[in-house]
């Protein structure tokens, strides 16, 4: 009996570890354009061999940058990712000034800003369908949520209405992610994410290990309050830049957190051991 329980524990541990890499975020950067098509092919094949089945592309438009458009390096790379067997979740439009604007705007201003940004994402969705013509399983909204800028209940209620309307206009399921600044109690925060998930949206919670903005016991409390269908994103990096500086990070081993019942993803591709070519391209670009 003891041997059976030991084997069962090993299997559960293996299943938890295997799930951790099933979905993987990729954040496109201009520096990535330096990779050849052969390098991309090898990278995506290696990613699939690692057990990843879904690639979540954080954005396909960042301000005025569209990464070459329908015939550019990003579109061609994602075609190769799909050919390697990876399912694609395509990110939409991201405003580079998003976090600055969140801090500047009051309630009515924030609602108007969000409405405009969601409109930009709808436009990007139509461009991707019409011009890029990639096979996808879901859309991803790049604008991350947190309980600092949405601490006020009225802001969360307004956002809920906007997300409901937005998701109904998409032709595939919507995914988004959130992180905690420690402003809402874990149970209240979990209930907020559950409300969003009730719209049919796949919600991902970022574990915050990479930025280290919250102590580990606090992060554990937030993870422990989450319903099982809320996904957990392990941050496979450690931030090396100081607050207020341009973001810099180095690869790090993800740390398990929360129950094994959650869907799992990692952030992000360039910090994984088999994707060193991406990290090197970024460092060689001279950009932060």
Show which residues each predicted segment covers.
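Boundary/entry segment of secreted carbohydrate-active catalytic domains
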Residues: 19-54, 58, 180, 270-273
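Short, acidic/polar
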Residues: 33-48, 121-128, 185-195, 247-256
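Catalytic domains of carbohydrate-active enzymes, especially glycoside hydrolases
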Residues: 37-63, 195-204, 260-264
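Aromatic-lined substrate-binding rim segments of carbohydrate-active enzymes
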Residues: 40-47, 56-98, 155-172, 219-225
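Aromatic-lined carbohydrate-recognition surfaces of secreted/lumenal glycan-active proteins
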Residues: 89-97, 140-144, 163-189, 204-209, ...
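Active-site-adjacent "subsite" loops/lids of carbohydrate-active enzymes
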Residues: 90, 96-126
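Active-site groove signature of glycoside hydrolases
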Residues: 123-153
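Substrate-binding cleft of secreted/luminal carbohydrate-active enzymes
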Residues: 205-216, 221-222, 227-288
